[in-house]
Amino acid sequence: MAGNTFGKLFTLSTFGESHGIAIGGVIDGCPPGLEISEADLQVDLDRRKPGTSRYTTARREEDEVQILSGVFEGKTTGTSIGLLIKNTDQRSNDYSKIKDTFRPGHADYTYQQKYGLRDYRGGGRSSARETAIRVAAGGVAKKFLKTHLGIEVRGYLSKLGPIKIDKVDHSVTNTNAFFCPDESKLEALDDYMRDLKKQGDSIGAKVSVVATNMPVGLGEPIFDRLDADLAHAMMGINAVKGVEVGDGFDTVEQKGSEHRDLMSADGFKSNRSGGVLGGISSGQDLVVHMALKPTSSISVPGESIDINGETAEVVTKGRHDPCVGIRAVPIAEAMMALVLMDHYLRHRGQNADVQSITPVIPAQSK
């Protein structure tokens, strides 16, 4: 099965299934000398892990990461970093009734047709359970970016169903179960999710990720543009159906005189481009948004087929997130960090000695 490795110089290869013994990953390309510990990685894993609120799946996994290699006396050695997270709360019997039936909207049918068989327990390899390792690996990248470059990556919920969140206060985001940056929206979110759970249904969401203190120059045109790789990374997250950089699809209604980010000696006048021009970071905040579909694992009956092609009714049991977008916030942060780490190393390898006669202008003032 191909497609398990991400990145060019800073790479992550993952393995494992939802109801297997464990999930794991191997990071290659991390520079030596980075101070890192399991506690560093656990911070974001605790933000992502299931069973921490009534708005997410009841599956309870401690998600305690083990660093198996590549770290000695608290510092990276420059060799492969092995990561492992054991699965401890599987309930495979919850899926016994669907082992011969395809859940509509899931990867059951496509995995069966591609490989001729599938691990039906919790979705197997297609489950978002795998993303825990991405979050752990992203913790390594985030630590390097922050300590060596001053780059900080932060995500938040920007829309859940019909509830739009415009105000962004990053100090609020991690104080609530929704990763919502606007405290005034919490009651509405809570009421909406309570009603949704009573209906046995699910809802989609929009998640935004921002990297601040960005340098100019990250991105490898033509085919490995920074925004192209970010879109690739975000689309690789389970349930993501759309990605925007900067103003994204809103640019359809903008005129050129409105959209272009004007510049002066004092800096940029706006950031509609989301911090990327020509596939290269401009030094402005890097802004990415992604849309996540509602999960199809719901108790509302739905029509499907079985492995023999016969019509069947499906009612999904088991423990599932009524809105997968909520726990996607730390996952999106991790994927952005992995992309930035990879592009920083690529830029350093080719252009470390490049000097431009043009001064770097400031990002748009907040």
Swiss-Prot record:
Reactions accelerated catalytically: 5-O-(1-carboxyvinyl)-3-phosphoshikimate = chorismate + phosphate
EC number: 4.2.3.5
Signal peptide: none
Cofactor note: Reduced FMN (FMNH(2)).
InterPro entries named in the record: Chorismate_synth, Chorismate_synth_AroC_sf, Chorismate_synthase_CS
Family to which the UniProt record says this protein belongs: Belongs to the chorismate synthase family.
Name this protein carries in UniProt: Chorismate synthase
Upper classification of the organism: Bacteria, Pseudomonadati, Pseudomonadota, Gammaproteobacteria, Alteromonadales
Encoding gene (name): aroC
